[in-house]
Amino acid sequence: MNSRKPRGSGRTPAVGKRGGPFQERDFQRQIGARKGAGRKGGPRHRDEPAPDFYDEDGRTRRTRRGKGAGAARAREKNLGRIHHEDGERLQKVMAAAGVASRRVCEDLISEGRVEVDGVVVTEPGVRVDPKTSVIRVDGVSVQTDVAKQYLVFNKPRGVISTMVDPDGRPSIATYLKSGQEHLFHVGRLDNETEGLLVLTNDGELANRLLHPSYEVPKTYLVQVKGPLPKGVSNQLKAGVELEDGPAKVDSFKLVDSTPGHVLVEVVLHSGKNRIVRRMFDAVGHPVERLVRVKIGPILLGDQKQGSVRVMNAQELGHLKAMVGL
């Protein structure tokens, strides 16, 4: 594995004069404003109340519980179908999957917020098979297969989106621990583009994230020279013609500006090669700096350049739900 990292990786550029290019702190201010959801699902104290799982709009989502003795009898009747005598206790499996501490998982179960194979479970004594049982908390799936890995990488500029580069240039593997080289990146960022890459060994999830039919949105911060004419926004939203067909952004928002430069946020679901750079070239405003800050519900937040973190249980659950898993 090549251990050489790109020069300047992770450093904060020197502050320039106002009116010059945006500095690292300007990008971090914009990225940091979007970091809230990336913190959900982190470690919790054992005495904290059971957490809510969240929709992307921030509203809590709870599983509806059946009412009355009839519903209770129906649930108990189904327990025999989902109970595995030789399996592991449900709260232990949930805790191992990173949902919460075992005690908090017991609270989630007793509140009727956990389903196993479509059956609401309220008794922590139920045993399940981690390999075959489908577990959901507040409707969000829980990943119980410990062999599968899901990582979030903040790619620095100058890093090649590949595991091994025959020319010896810095690659993704430069930043991974021993034994993680078997993971593959979902999509790619060109050499000069920074930001969020998902790394996994889950082939089905990767295929769905890349398939255009699922239209997974990607969010970018784009720096270009200013001033930017008002018509550029409408052009990009209406669509521009590229050599491989038309392309358009789903949304366009001006987030900051100086006398000489403009910082915008664009959202699009296309995964074509260098699509953002080519679209801005087409409207006469070449990209100076490009950072991907979000894929679906996964946020870059304040994650440091060159760092790799494990995707938390809630992020993974929402990401899978977005692509029908």
Where do the language-model regions lie?
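Basic, flexible Lys/Arg- and Gly-enriched helix-loop patches that mediate nucleic-acid binding at interfaces
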Residues: 16, 69-325
